[in-house]
Design a protein with these regions (language model features):
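Outer-membrane beta-barrel proteins
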Residues: 38, 140-142, 171-190, 244-253, ...
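Acidic, small-polar-rich N-terminal luminal/periplasmic segments of exported/outer-membrane proteins
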Residues: 21-129
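Single conserved hydrophobic/aromatic residue that forms the stacking wall/gate
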Residues: 1-16
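Exposed, low-structure sequence patches enriched in small/polar residues
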Residues: 14, 128-130, 244-307, 312, ...
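Short strand-turn segments of transmembrane beta-barrel domains in outer membranes
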Residues: 105-111, 119-153, 175-176
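Hydrophobic/aromatic-rich, well-ordered segments within soluble, folded domains that form packed cores
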Residues: 149-173, 435-437, 441
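Transmembrane beta-strand segments that form the barrel wall of outer-membrane beta-barrel proteins
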Residues: 131-141, 164-176, 414-427
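Outer-membrane beta-barrel translocator/channel fold
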Residues: 82-85, 176-184, 190-255, 446-466
């Protein structure tokens, strides 16, 4: 069952910001250089776009407005052909297809909720001619295992340059097993300022996810051989299956502040066309761009249990609390500076070239070991401490400098490509290497559009902190 509401009303057009460069303003501009930008569709009332990693290049992101099978969009299976998860919407999930798995975060506890977390690469930005509102509500399941999801987005333009908006996503799922429910809340405020010479996209987001934990079933035969345990019952409620523990929660919280901006350098070219008043039209020709991106993340994780039975699952306990209360947190600040030569910056150059440097600072906070407590050769506590004067946490700092470059061709249909390389130059991740690329070609096949696309990467990276 689903309810959907969509209201449309405000709009602006993304300006053409990637016209190719001409070495002289007196030269004629070929028609190929006057084609619309990949993120400029002036005929549409609403345009949705996303940003490329680190550099913030805008590209069109299709907006799903199809009502056919809309209810399936909430299902976890809508994210991949094969997903492993805990039966209900909002539970930790991971795709089973290798090439769909993303590089793990240093804060690995958020990886299990990747489908529900907004990042700079999956965040939507908008350009509207009329105010736009979309509210969706989906629900499913019986009263004992009901799942509800409410999503909404509101955005509008102020003139042709400024767009602001906000969105929220709320999931409440009771789960199909004992101690299997979850509650997820996330929201985001975003905005953009786009002119020929200056572009800015920014957002701040926050999420708070709470997930009940049960450690799994005590007997897998309830799933593998349910008839053997039915005891002459036709149906057994899955909520009655015995689990390893209850009264246990896993809370993951996070916030993010993201801003990317660029200043385009170039010149103004007069066209042969005139406006309604008879003035000669002018178009800005960008040659290069100076780019700055700042990304700050703050994440926290807390694992709480009031069930004494959890001691049978985790034989080694850390700390002196009567109940389990494990906490950790981290933050990282990433600054990227880049210089880009726009695609077609010379008549012979049918590609764009970008060089960048990234400075990343990370801090992790863990519960400290108790002085006087014998942790043994494996680090596990085995005796009472001799003192209670001990710090509550320990802090670990990391810093890394990366350099990299990108070669891309995003215009045209016959052949487009993008190749990016990144090297950890100094610091905690010195020696890290990332090389990734994609290639796409389009052609006619039996009078139909056909596309062939290839992707690949080579990585040599350090393990996540945890």
């Amino acid at each position: 069952y689903e309810i959907s509401a969509c209201l449309v009303g405000s709009e602006m057009c993304i300006r053409d910001s990637s016209l190719s460069n001409l070495s002289s303003s007196n030269k004629e501009i070929p028609d190929s250089l006057l084609q619309t930008d990949s993120a400029a569709l002036k005929s549409k009332r609403i345009i949705g776009y996303r940003l490329t990693p680190l550099l913030g290049e805008r590209y069109i992101a299709p907006m799903d407005t199809n009502r056919l099978n809309f209810g399936n969009s909430t299902l976890v299976e809508a994210n991949s052909l094969a997903v492993g998860y805990l039966a209900n919407v909002g539970s930790p999930a991971q795709t089973r297809i290798f090439n769909e798995r993303k590089e793990e975060r240093d804060f690995i506890f958020a990886d299990a909720y990747d489908y529900y977390i907004t990042t700079p690469t999956n965040a939507y930005f908008y350009d509207t001619k009329v105010p736009y509102t979309q509210v969706t509500y989906t629900t499913g399941g019986a009263s004992q295992n009901k799942m509800d999801r409410l999503k909404g987005v509101l955005t509008m333009n102020f003139g042709k340059k400024i767009n602001v908006g906000g969105e929220m996503d709320y999931i409440y799922s009771r789960g199909y097993y004992n101690s299997n429910g979850n509650k997820l809340l996330s929201y985001r405020f975003f905005g953009s300022y786009i002119t020929d010479r200056y572009e800015l996209n920014a957002y701040l987001s926050n999420f708070n996810f709470v997930n009940y934990e049960n450690g799994g079933l005590t007997n897998d035969q309830y799933i593998t051989n349910p008839d053997d345990l039915a005891e002459n019952q036709r149906n057994i409620d899955s909520k009655s299956y015995p689990v390893r523990y209850t009264d246990t929660w896993n809370r993951v919280r996070g916030k993010q502040y993201f801003l990317t901006q660029r200043y385009n350098l170039g010149f103004t070219k007069e066209l042969e066309e005139t406006d309604e008043e008879g003035n000669v039209k002018e178009v800005f020709i960008p040659v290069s761009s100076i780019i700055h991106t700042i990304d700050y993340e703050d994440n926290r994780r807390r694992f709480i249990s009031n069930d004494a039975g959890i001691d049978t699952c985790y034989t080694h306990l850390y700390g002196m609390d009567a109940s389990l209360n494990d906490q950790t947190s981290s933050w990282n600040l990433k600054n990227t500076f880049a210089l880009a030569l726009r695609e077609g910056f010379q008549d012979w150059a049918k590609f764009g070239l970008t060089a960048f440097v990234t400075f990343e600072k990370r801090r992790f906070r863990l519960a400290s070991q108790v002085p006087g407590l014998d942790y043994g050769p494996d680090g596990h506590g085995s005796s009472e401490p001799s003192t209670l004067n001990f710090p509550t946490s320990e802090v670990y700092d990391e810093f890394t400098t990366y350099i990299g470059g990108e070669l891309s061709k995003r215009r045209g249909s016959l052949l487009t490509y993008n190749v990016r390389g990144e090297l950890g130059l100094a610091g905690s991740d010195a020696g890290e290497v990332r090389v990734s690329g994609d290639l796409q070609t389009k052609f006619k096949l039996f009078k139909k559009d056909a596309t062939i696309k290839a992707e690949g990467y080579i990585k040599n990276i350090t393990p996540a902190f945890y």
